[in-house]
Swiss-Prot record:
Keyword tags: Aminoacyl-tRNA synthetase, ATP-binding, Cytoplasm, Ligase, Magnesium, Metal-binding, Nucleotide-binding, Protein biosynthesis
SUPFAM superfamilies for this protein: Class II aaRS and biotin synthetases, Nucleic acid-binding proteins
Name listed for the protein in its UniProt record: Lysine--tRNA ligase
GO cellular component term, pick one: cytosol
Organism: Neisseria meningitidis serogroup A / serotype 4A (strain DSM 15465 / Z2491)
Annotated family: Belongs to the class-II aminoacyl-tRNA synthetase family.
């Protein structure tokens, strides 16, 4: 189908000429009537009509003369003698329209033949099946509801330029069914997570997006200024410390799904603003949090894919089986069996090996930090099926509870799937004096040049001094979860309007 039978054929024109021609058409419409009417009332969606009537045979359907009113964007159009066909697209799918001079006046047909692909129309008529069995609306009335002044991408090539996809998401959503389905699935994933949390008796809350002190994660914040108070404020890098204040206050199970902001680099896995869920449960620990994370992810996969055995980038991922658990050193040795325990506890050897794997040396020189940096360089990217890495060093876990049995380690985990981090959680540190000392250590790191080290949060210490129950907490990156469950290779494919360099 094409517009080649139109009175003037757009494919022979460049984009500026097409826009000029369409503006002229709009000007002519304005001379005759309201060019943007708002009184057409749709009563049917394309997908609902196909679901209800798609399997009914022509002989049974046609005599019923079922009346419908449909509306959408015109995606295809062709003329066959005195009759015209068009396909319109609404949020649910597409349906075909059929017009001839028996159903509408010649004047309406003439108007219709001057309309363009991309125009938004409303049509009413009755359902029938073509000789080829396609469900179609026999049009008795049709109106132009909104003129498209810019041409759509070629229907065969689609919107292939990645930069344009992200900058002009509105065009991408029109042209690419795959993109539409990804964002529909994103909504379903978030809803499944929310429903799961409510089913576990968690209370959804909202905490501040602007913080007087950045905290809850080691990251570089965005800074703004509050004019009335004449103070700097920081877009939140994580909601953690506010959510734990609520646990102190007696809200024993809380969660928040919202945006966080980090003033850092962009990549296929990173966007400066991103969505995450954080949840906290009193009288719980990191074992419970690992099970919660596992159940949330598995449930979301079943919701949108009907299975927890999925494919990512052409390779199978098993979300159904219990997730593997390894320590940092176990993971390193799993993929590098030639490393010895002596080497993995030798700071100078670790530094050389970290550089060899292309990683930067951590600001903190402790053995734990060096082991973590080596893990990131030689093992993290190989963790394909879901794997919890557990028992992180104290020096890289300033908010996590120290292990009672493992010297220098904490009850902390990170979850990795398809070679990247998806979740982070721990048994929360609830000793206010220990927390104060760790904040001081973070301040010392910041003074030594670590921009991502935490600030000292005196109010959070004050809250802890009222008594924080034993608590487990976890954060899951929603964007990365959507990437995983929709087989999307870059975070920009799952964020409607990702951050881009100015045009």
């Amino acid at each position: 189908m094409s517009e080649q039978n139109h009175p003037q054929t757009e494919p022979q024109l460049d984009e500026n000429q097409i826009i000029a021609l369409r503006r002229e058409k709009l000007h002519n419409i304005r001379q005759q009537r309201n060019a943007y009417p708002n009184d057409f009332k749709r009563d049917s969606f394309a997908a609902d009509l196909h679901a209800q009537y798609g399997e009914i045979g022509k002989e049974e359907l046609d005599p019923q003369g079922i009346p419908v009113k449909v509306a959408g964007r015109m995606m295809l159009k062709r003329q066959m003698g005195k009759a015209s066909f068009a396909t319109i697209q609404d949020v649910s799918g597409q349906i075909q329209l059929y017009l001839n001079n028996k159903g509408v006046s010649q004047e309406v047909l003439d108007d219709f033949n001057h309309w363009d692909l991309g125009d938004i129309v409303g049509a009413e008529g009755t359902l029938f099946k073509t000789n080829h069995g396609e469900l179609t609306v026999r049009v008795s009335g049709i109106r132009l509801l909104s003129k498209s002044l810019r041409p759509l991408p070629d229907k065969h090539k689609g919107l292939s330029d990645q930069e344009t996809k992200y900058r002009q998401r509105y065009v991408d959503l029109i042209a690419n069914e795959e993109s539409r389905n990804t964002f529909i699935k994103r909504s379903q994933i978030i809803q499944s997570v929310r429903n799961f949390m409510v089913g576990e008796h968690y209370l959804e809350v909202e905490t501040p997006m602007m913080h007087p002190i950045p905290g809850g994660a080691t990251a570089k914040p965005f800074v703004t200024h509050h004019n009335a108070l004449d103070i700097p404020l920081y877009l939140r890098i994580a909601p953690e410390l506010y959510l734990k204040r609520l646990v102190v206050g007696g809200l024993e199970r809380v969660f928040e799904i919202n945006r966080s902001f980090r003033n850092e680099g962009m990549s296929v896995r990173h966007n400066p603003e991103f969505t995450m869920i954080e949840f906290y449960e009193a009288f719980s620990d990191y074992e419970r949090m690992m099970q919660m994370a596992e159940d949330i992810i598995r449930n979301a996969s079943h919701t949108v894919n009907g299975t927890a055995n999925i494919t990512y980038n052409g390779k199978e991922v098993d979300l159904e089986s219990p997730f593997e658990r390894l320590t940092i050193l176990e993971a390193i040795k799993k993929y590098n069996p030639h490393y010895t325990d002596e080497q993995l506890n030798d700071a100078e050897w670790l530094k050389k090996e970290i550089v060899k794997h292309g990683e930067s040396l951590p600001p903190s020189p402790g053995i734990g930090s060096l082991q973590l940096a080596l893990f990131e360089g030689c093992a993290e990217g190989k963790l394909w099926n879901p794997t919890f890495i557990v028992d992180y060093p104290v020096e890289v876990s300033p908010l996590a509870r120290a292990s009672d049995t493992k010297q220098g380690l904490t009850e902390r985990f990170e979850l990795f799937v398809v070679g990247r981090e998806l979740a982070n959680g721990y048994s929360e540190l609830n000793d206010p004096e220990d927390q104060a000392e760790r904040f001081k250590a973070q301040v010392a790191q910041k003074d030594a040049g670590d921009d991502e080290a935490m600030h000292y949060d005196a109010d959070y210490i004050r809250a802890m001094e009222f008594g924080l129950p034993p608590t487990g907490g976890c954060g899951i990156g929603i964007d990365r979860l959507v990437m995983l469950l929709t087989d999307s290779q870059t975070i920009r494919d799952v964020i409607l309007f990702p951050q881009m360099r100015p045009e």
